[in-house]
Amino acid sequence: MFGFLNLNKPPDWTSHDCVAKVRKILKTKRVGHGGTLDPMATGVLPIAVGAATRLLAYLPENKAYRAKIQLGLSTDTDDITGKAIATCPWPDLTLEAVKPHLAEFIGNIAQIPPMYSAIHKDGRRLYELARKGEIIAVEPRQVKIDQITVLDWLEGEFPQIELDIHCGSGTYIRSLARDLGKVLAVGGTLASLTRTESCGFQLADSINLEALMVNSEGLISPRIALAHLDWISFTPERVIDWFHGRKINLTDTNVIIGSLVAVESLEAQFLGIGEIVVAEDEYYLQPKIVIQQ
């Protein structure tokens, strides 16, 4: 088996739970995912099967989420599943007062990950430390948020705002919820989260585990998953050189050094990914990932 799945992760499942279930359904051990989703979250969880696990790092990085943020409430996990640590009811808070602050989170920003996260600190995961009551300083990380759009606003003692968020890899929406609450001086926590896009896969095209159990055929091909890359077809002679790890001379000089190119045979068999390099004024495609099916 070789290819990808666009899985719609159910609530209360870890990403690892989903991988284990897919392994069982497809009867294969070589399965991986393209980016962890918190157990409470739903939505797109890219799954790679077989040798496609080697291609996960080459999928598009941008992600999109639909998030509901509860204002006036702070929790230890920065989401609604955690323990409340502060409340600040604010029934008079309006959307007009919140909107200007959303712009503060657009662009390249420094973001502190939640204490309850899988990030390593001194060889241990942060959530392991948090569960033992060891709260430590977490260094901010640079992340990029491209767009934030307001979808809905619910008034009340604890107002709720629903957002459509487009961002880069590594962005924590729980941190965004917490930090929005901080700038408003009322606190905030993530009430619900759905990932609508990840690694080039869209929620509208996803399948759930029940559907996969009924029909486990039809993995997504690299041709679709790697459509953002340039592609090149090799003759049988060049395929042999490719399989031996030799760099392939390119006749087309209209290329960008360092760019990645997906490779297939004339029969459309996927062969891997190469990087364009230059040596002695000649352009070559250097194998990075070689796939022999």
Swiss-Prot record:
EC number in record: 5.4.99.25
Function as written in the Swiss-Prot or TrEMBL entry: Responsible for synthesis of pseudouridine from uracil-55 in the psi GC loop of transfer RNAs.
GO molecular function per UniProt: RNA binding; tRNA pseudouridine(55) synthase activity
Organism of origin: Microcystis aeruginosa (strain NIES-843 / IAM M-2473)
SUPFAM superfamilies cross-referenced by the UniProt entry: Pseudouridine synthase (SSF55120)
UniProt name for this protein: tRNA pseudouridine synthase B
Top EC class of this enzyme: isomerase
Keyword tRNA processing: yes
Key word Acetylation present: no
Encoding gene per record: truB
Family: Belongs to the pseudouridine synthase TruB family. Type 1 subfamily.
Biological process annotations from GO: mRNA pseudouridine synthesis; tRNA pseudouridine synthesis
